[in-house]
Amino acid sequence: MRTDLEKNKHYYAVIFTSNLSNDTTDYSTTSEKMEELAKQQPGFLGVESARDHLGLGITISYWESLEAIENWKTNALHIEAKKRGREQWYENFHLRICLVEKEFKFHKGTL
């Protein structure tokens, strides 16, 4: 994740939880392209993502503002990818947008 989060007192997290369908043709390639595109968007702060062997995935992207999230939501290439996700890649998904007011970190070996 990018360290831009440390510079922002408050920021937003978009939590996207999904279960993949059996047809994941082009999913990985498109997912990588969307991450690269998101990184270029004004207000993007970082992303973390994980998926298990059964297809359950959680991606959390971090943004400076609700306006930045809305701009990403309405990006033409992102809209195309979301459409394909609904039609082909996902059995289901759940999206949450949260305001992050505090964050705490731990690194082994540091005080």
Give residue spans per PLM region.
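Short loop-to-helix capping motifs
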Residues: 64-66
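Short S/T/G/P-rich N-terminal loop/turn motif that feeds into the first structured element of a domain
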Residues: 1-57, 68-73, 90-111
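Short, conserved catalytic or adaptor-binding loops enriched in Gly and charged residues
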Residues: 85-88
